[in-house]
Amino acid sequence: MLDAKTIEAIADELLEAARTRTPVPRLTARYPGMTVEDSYAVQQLWRRRNEEAGRTLVGRKIGLTSKAMQAATGITEPDYGAIFDDMVLETGCSVAWDKYTHPRVEVELAFVLKDALKGPGCTIFDVLNATDYVVPALEILDSRIEMEGRTIVDTIADNAAMGAMVVGGNPVRPDAVDLRWVSAILYKNQTVEETGVAAGVLDHPANGVHWLANKIAAHGDSMKAGDIILAGSFTRPLWVYKGDTVHADYGPLGSITCRFE
């Protein structure tokens, strides 16, 4: 376990890395005893510093929701990070590629809450009842920590690699479609790069949301009405570069397009 002074130093280092767009050396290489709970402590302090600087928390992202990704990272549960107001973009936008370090894109669904959600004991039925609508979303992954050799402990401290999100397509009520069967085709520059179905997110994307409610309850937190929850990716991360146009076709749920400038 890390002491409070070290946790504060890491949070400050990550704030500076985001400001300068310069990744820091891997935390687990420098602090081999660092734990997942240490990482969440860093993330919570980092979030508080951002809120003190004027950013507004509008939701959470859930990561590492697929069994393949969990096996690859040697963990048995997802992770989560904060979404701030200035991270939420709309389809058709131009994204400043230079704003991010190692940007990648994933295909997801976002849940927008009409009621508060609080654990422990939150179930998938609580999530569906508390959801106003579900809408297609792309997540733009960022990294303030060097990529090579990075572990879940590094990623959690780095706000679960959250960079931004792009929302678009057609909002639907959570009971209007079978969310497990929502699918998407991800294009880069008119070439199909990835395809996926939302059942790849813990068998149902709402399962990630109730996991989140129960997990953050252990950290003394909860979700409020109006929060946006990125439920987890059902494609592999797609590397993007300056000049790339990304398009995600969700079929009946519409599409999302953005260009990296």
Model-inferred region functions:
Residues 209-237:
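A conserved acidic, glycine/proline-rich C-terminal tail/linker
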